[in-house]
């Protein structure tokens, strides 16, 4: 299985002669979702002349990051909030919440039916990616459960979503997006409630404002940490990185991103009715997008904001940390053991990072060969100065520049 087969692509064809065009079925209702997403992109560009904001909103609403500046995309990834652009449960929850605000239907069945129809159309419109298919199916289960007088079960709906996806395309199991989406959701289902209860239990006072703040922080932190439980090994394997700032980033950025998503959706829909009104709403979206990018950039300037598995000792630390917390989970109920485990994991992490920095510098000048898949890449470094000689091949599936940058970051 490859990345192509996971997306249902089993053959690559190359044109050798001149291209010819023929009349097709562009006007067919079959292509309505594609025409809708095209119209959405055109309207976004008309509402926000600022290219950076338009690209951010397009990525947020449709998952298409092709227009984003490389710097903005890299900042969001390093801050641990790139999942905002992977259309998933977060977007579906925002969309259902927005529908509840815009369409205050008294009848629960009618409201649930409208929400399901919109979710299915949105799912097809953004391209039937595994993450959005999983999210929409789980959201439909959640909406349908009260109507059928049943309780919604997270593991059941998650399993049903996986079954539907694999029945349609068994090769999708090799897709990175499917693995990350289901791993994050499994962590949320298994651990989010427990972690939230633990954090809320740290404050035993009765002051409502303080309790509201504690509940808000607990909900965000528990969701971030729970989603990371099973995704950290995958991000280490596929992206060679581990964002230490992800919980803090989600706490500071996610609320603003949620409001920007809903306001951008309303502004874009308003743009089809009256463009000046949409541009007025667009100023609010612009401010929220500026805040998100500024905050993400500020967090990535903090020392140690991310760790790179170019540090060969970091993978051993990761195994140690998982073994440590697994041992805590299968032993007694005392909470103090988790504090001890966190302290031990933090101390050994500092030792791991420091050891790699120390051992990567043997003298006044050093040379290192970096594995970039195909071709060669050599680092020459002395003190705080470094030079990259060659940087692999453009035919490699590895992002050569990112791999070299990760190696330099891991050496301090």
Locate predicted features:
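Internal transmembrane alpha-helical bundles of multi-pass membrane proteins
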Residues: 128-322
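Glycine- and aromatic-enriched alpha-helical transmembrane segments of multi-pass membrane proteins
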Residues: 214, 218, 303-366
């Amino acid at each position: 299985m490859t990345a192509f087969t996971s997306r249902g692509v089993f053959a690559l064809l190359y044109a050798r002669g001149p291209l010819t065009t023929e009349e097709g079925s562009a006007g067919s209702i079959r292509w309505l979702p594609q025409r809708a997403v095209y119209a959405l992109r055109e309207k976004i560009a008309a509402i926000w002349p600022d290219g950076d904001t338009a690209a951010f909103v397009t990525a947020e609403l449709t998952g298409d990051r092709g227009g984003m500046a490389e710097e903005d995309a890299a900042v969001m990834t390093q801050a641990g909030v790139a999942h905002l652009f992977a259309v998933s449960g977060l977007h579906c929850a925002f969309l259902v919440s927005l529908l509840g605000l815009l369409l205050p239907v008294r009848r629960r069945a009618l409201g649930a039916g409208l929400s399901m129809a919109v979710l299915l159309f949105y799912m097809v419109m953004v391209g039937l990616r595994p993450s959005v298919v999983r999210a929409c199916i789980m959201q439909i289960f959640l909406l349908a459960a009260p109507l059928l007088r049943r309780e919604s079960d997270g593991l059941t709906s998650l399993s049903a979503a996986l079954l539907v996806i694999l029945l349609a395309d068994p090769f999708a199991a090799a897709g990175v997006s499917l693995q990350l989406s289901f791993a994050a959701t499994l962590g949320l289902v298994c651990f989010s409630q427990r972690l939230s209860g633990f954090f809320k239990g740290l404050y035993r006072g009765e002051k409502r404002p303080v309790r509201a703040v504690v509940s808000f922080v607990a909900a965000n932190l528990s969701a971030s940490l729970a989603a990371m439980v099973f995704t950290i090994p995958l991000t280490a394997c596929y992206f060679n990185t581990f964002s230490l700032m992800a919980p803090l980033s989600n706490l500071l950025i996610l609320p603003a991103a949620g409001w920007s998503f809903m306001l951008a959706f309303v502004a874009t829909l308003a743009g089809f009715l009256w463009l000046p009104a949409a541009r007025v709403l667009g100023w609010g979206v612009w401010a929220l997008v500026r805040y998100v990018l500024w905050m993400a950039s500020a967090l990535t300037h903090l020392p140690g904001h991310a760790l790179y598995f170019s540090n060969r000792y970091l993978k051993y630390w990761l195994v140690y940390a998982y073994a440590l917390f697994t041992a805590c989970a299968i032993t007694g109920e005392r909470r103090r053991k988790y504090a001890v485990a966190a302290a031990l994991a933090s101390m050994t992490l500092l030792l791991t990072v420091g050891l790699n920095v120390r051992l990567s510098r043997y003298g006044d000048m050093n040379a290192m060969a970096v594995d970039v898949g195909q071709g060669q890449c050599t680092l020459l470094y002395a003190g705080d100065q470094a030079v990259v000689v060659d940087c692999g091949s453009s035919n490699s599936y590895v992002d050569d520049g990112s791999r070299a940058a990760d190696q330099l970051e891991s050496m301090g």
